[in-house]
């Protein structure tokens, strides 16, 4: 056997030393390939290790069902606030701000925290989410100017967070809505607000400006995640896309409740939806009423959850039942997505969604506790 190998080496014109060198190189190359193949999963996981640990720690501090029930059982808004003051995550902000503003600050801090720690490949979507604070502050400022609030009342509406907070705070003495819009020149929101300004001037209502900001936010959010190159980004795209679909549905349902036409709604709908594509959205916008919007969703993943809410809608004619059903669906969908990549994006999506739900539920409880004698059983029904 050895003689045959030696003969083959000689016939190839190689010396024994050259052959040995080639063998060593081959072993190194094969070894490198094996290392790359086996280490790739580790390389994919590594960027998520620290962020996942951070959000898991915070997730452990979220209220469980027992704690939420205890909060519902508080007798009034004062007891409600005292309960939250015993929770480190809420204690500091509640010492300085009223409860509604404190909850908004907690939400803003959550977005900023996740945008800061998220791995680079998915960070852009969470950065966009963190901009909701600036957008909400702009909307509050526009509303304040529309209804003629004082400077003090206007400042109370602003959430002391976000990139533009100080700039917006300096505009509380602006002369009116148009002055606010022109003063935002140089920000990323300038163009979208200026484009919507003629509609405001024709109608005298800031709804056109607010809706333009909402659409810009959804466009930015969808654009930030629309290249699902790997499983983590695919999950992110599903999470973001579902948010866009639900925002479109809420807008269409509200519009049909107010008997608005296709032409009234279309400018504010994001046509590039996720599962609800342009043709389907067009059909829904052309529906004559809320009931036909719901029936028009047959065959989509939103059909069952909204159909189940129809009975309550028929009882009280309140579209709040649909909005709650959609919020609950988003929460359930996020929970399902969070389990698909436990060593990747999963914990991040799970935490953000659960924190959003917690804050929404706390706001529901706070509003109810301001009404004397509001039944606790009714509050539990209202929670997401």
From Swiss-Prot:
Biological process annotations from GO: proton motive force-driven plasma membrane ATP synthesis
- Please indicate if the UniProt record lists Membrane as a keyword: yes
Please state where this protein is localized: Cell membrane
Report the membrane topology from the UniProt record.
Peripheral membrane protein
Keywords, A to Z, come to: ATP synthesis, Cell membrane, Hydrogen ion transport, Ion transport, Membrane, Transport
Cellular component, GO annotation = plasma membrane; proton-transporting V-type ATPase, V0 domain
Which function does this protein serve?
Component of the A-type ATP synthase that produces ATP from ADP in the presence of a proton gradient across the membrane.
Assembly information from the UniProt record: Has multiple subunits with at least A(3), B(3), C, D, E, F, H, I and proteolipid K(x).
- What's this protein's name? A-type ATP synthase subunit C
Organism expressing this protein natively:
Methanobrevibacter smithii (strain ATCC 35061 / DSM 861 / OCM 144 / PS)
């Amino acid at each position: 056997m050895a003689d045959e190998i030696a003969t083959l080496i000689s016939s190839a014109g190689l010396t024994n030393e050259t052959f040995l060198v080639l063998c060593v190189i081959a072993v190194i190359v094969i070894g490198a390939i094996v290392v790359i193949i086996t280490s790739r999963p580790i390389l994919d996981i590594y960027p998520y290790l620290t962020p996942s640990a951070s959000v898991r720690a915070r997730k452990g501090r979220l209220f469980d069902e027992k704690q939420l029930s205890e909060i519902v059982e508080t007798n009034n808004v004062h007891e409600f606030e005292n309960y939250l003051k015993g929770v480190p995550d809420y204690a500091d902000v509640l010492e300085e701000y009223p409860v509604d503003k404190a909850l908004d600050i907690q939400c803003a801090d959550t977005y900023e925290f996740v945008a800061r720690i998220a791995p680079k490949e998915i960070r852009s979507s969470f950065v966009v989410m963190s901009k909701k604070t600036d957008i909400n502050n702009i909307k509050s400022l526009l509303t304040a100017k529309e209804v003629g609030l004082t400077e003090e009342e206007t400042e109370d509406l602003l959430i002391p967070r976000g990139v533009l907070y100080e700039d917006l705070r300096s505009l509380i003495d602006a002369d009116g809505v148009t002055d606010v819009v022109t003063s935002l020149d140089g920000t990323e929101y300038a163009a979208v607000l200026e484009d919507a300004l003629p509609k405001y001037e024709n109608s005298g209502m800031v709804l056109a400006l607010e809706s333009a900001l909402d659409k810009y936010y959804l466009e930015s959010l969808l654009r930030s995640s629309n290249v699902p190159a790997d499983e983590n980004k695919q999950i992110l795209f599903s999470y973001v896309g579902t948010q866009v679909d639900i925002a479109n549905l809420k807008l269409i349902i509200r519009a049909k409740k107010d008997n608005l036409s296709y032409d009234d709604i279309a400018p504010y709908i994001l046509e590039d939806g996720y599962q609800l594509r342009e043709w389907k959205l067009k059909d829904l916008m052309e529906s004559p009423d809320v009931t036909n919007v719901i029936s028009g969703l047959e065959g989509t993943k939103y059909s069952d959850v909204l159909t189940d809410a129809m009975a309550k809608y028929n009882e009280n004619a309140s579209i709040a039942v649909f909005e709650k059903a959609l919020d609950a669906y988003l929460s359930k969908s996020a929970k399902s997505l969070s389990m698909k990549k436990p060593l990747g994006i999963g914990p991040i999506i799970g935490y953000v969604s659960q924190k959003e739900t917690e804050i929404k539920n706390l706001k529901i409880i706070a509003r109810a506790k301001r009404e004397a004698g509001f039944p606790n059983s009714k509050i539990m029904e209202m929670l997401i």
